[in-house]
From Swiss-Prot:
Gene: hisS
Designated name of the protein: Histidine--tRNA ligase
GO BP: any one term: histidyl-tRNA aminoacylation
Subunit structure: Homodimer.
Protein localization: Cytoplasm
Family indicated by similarity: Belongs to the class-II aminoacyl-tRNA synthetase family.
Principal subcellular localization: cytoplasm
Annotated keywords: Aminoacyl-tRNA synthetase, ATP-binding, Cytoplasm, Ligase, Nucleotide-binding, Protein biosynthesis
Catalytic reaction equation(s): tRNA(His) + L-histidine + ATP = L-histidyl-tRNA(His) + AMP + diphosphate + H(+)
Keyword Nucleotide-binding: yes
Amino acid sequence: MKVALPKGVFDIFPYITDAKHMWRHTSLWHRVEDVIHEVCDLYGFSEIRTPVFEKSEVFLHVGEQSDIVKKEMYTFLDKKGRSLTLRPEGTAPIVRSFIDNPMSQREDNKFYYILPMFRYERQQSGRYRQHHQFGVEAIGVRHPLRDAEVLSLLWNFYSAIGLQYMQIQLNFLGGSATRKRYDQVLRGYFLQHLDSLSSLSKERFNTNLLRILDSKEPEDQEIIKSAPPILEYVSDEDRKYFDEILSALSALNIPYSINSRLVRGLDYYTDVVFEAITTFGGHSYALGGGGRYDGLIAASGGVATPACGFGVGLERVIQTLLAQGNLTLPSSHKLRLIPVEPEADSFCFVWAQHLRSLGIPTEVDWTHKKLKAALKTADTEKVTFVCPIGERELLSEQLTIKNMSLRQEFSGSKQEVEQRLLYEIQNTSL
């Protein structure tokens, strides 16, 4: 009996050829991940990897009234009855790790991660129950230029992978005094419209007032549009902090806009929040977001420590890159040896190992199909170089390398073709 994948998950696979599923091609993921490592290294961020599952209480500080905690977590009991949860987001586990490792803490801690997340999402396009997230967390420093630096890293990532039509949207939620003052104003406003709000927003009115601004329900939109903006109620100190972030973005020519309705879906955010928005194909949607969360570490049992960060869903990033035509399969510069006759098998086996020791990616076609069919397969699979080897090549000690991309070939002794292959791989962009 065939066993199918559960709903909401997918394989990242190396042999995909159809356009619809090309976003799942392993090589595309490698390319994006390589850019992440390069950009984060430029900014002095170090990779962190946390366990796939944590004690469930780790995620309660995300906000017990958040959709993630209430509806989307994969939570189970182990054999001793302890509640464990598959990681639904990246920040809370890193905060847990930071608190767990006090001897490893520095005054300024800069982490990044590329990890799978697990959420019981409703089935819809672009939403997956296992998805992959790139994120950074900067823990230990509170400074507007640190926030701007994190935003700069995010922007440089988008630029480096070739995303277009991007803009940063920002809002400022303020500290506890600003939030308390604004909460009173917002509660009074929504109370006037309570009967017209969606059932979800009526629930949030009593549990998480600010999240009403994040509602996607049609009946809430006109009411939200007229809600008083929080920036009218921030303190002078908060406004100065926010303005310094905006000035820094302008200095780096990073396009941004202020969205006074922007709040984040996780309850731990304070002060600056942001989303990276692309407008493409007649639609606008977020490709990442984050903000500052100065209260989360203390709420999680640690010493009060300022922090900020962001998360980016990689599935949507790769799909958008393909839609914009800015991501293609890279050439592997792979060499495939084709033993035309069984007598060439041993030679191919030994030479392939030598070629690999030189740094030339090499594989052997052991199918022993006819040469024409073997060449057609190599062409379909976008193998860059092939070398058919039979009795004639073994006797003459002359080998021919076919460049399948350029439809060219070159011949010579074993040492000569090795040198030519090294040159081609190091100096040719195919």
